[in-house]
Amino acid sequence: VSKIFFSGIGGSGVSAIASFMADKGHIVVGSDRSFDDNPAHPVYNILKSKNVSIVPQDGSGLDSSFDFVVFSTAVEADQPEVIKARRIGIPMQTRPEYLAKIVTGFKTIAVAGTSGKSTTAGMLAFIMQRLGMRPNFIGGGRVKQFKTEHNAGNAIAGDSDRLVIEACESDGTIIDYKPEHSIILNLELDHHSVEKTAAMFEILGGNTSGMIILNSDDAHLEKVP
């Protein structure tokens, strides 16, 4: 069991991983400025229902008892928790970096592409669940069928070794994912040039141990060797 601090825990990507790790039995503590401003935030209540401790985002809740800290990429370098984590020597990683580590512990299906990732990853996890495959799921969007009083719909903790993730190329960490299977939906000018994104998709394909499924109707995906 790990003791994990999530800074920026209210965002869709970070809250998904925090919820997932709490459901897997880990000790989860987090902070978010949106919770400081609005304690009635719906994600706040869902996390609290999972026994996640929420603290002010001023560094006061962070100490050396934590195994590591996961930061949202929206958290600034001069934020109090970043400064304190560096000062007391707690290992630090961004949300995408931590997701890449989680991927290695499962037979992961990574859903990539410049659009449609959230929808496709959610649909795939839902279909797998209905088929009795008991999948794990960490997404960016919220799946209506997964929403409950205790679940925002962006993650489920199944009891199988299968994990479905949304693999975003925006910050470049997609090249660190090593999934079993990959699905690449499309390729358009988005966060990066078509050529740069194609190069990242090529690396993802090289890191994929099993099948790679590409949309053959997308002309830009022809740029992915």
Regions found by a protein language model. Name each.
Residues 1-94, 98, 219:
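N-terminal leader/targeting and accessory segments in enzymes
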Residues 20-24, 61-62, 73-225:
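Phosphate-binding loop of NTP-binding sites
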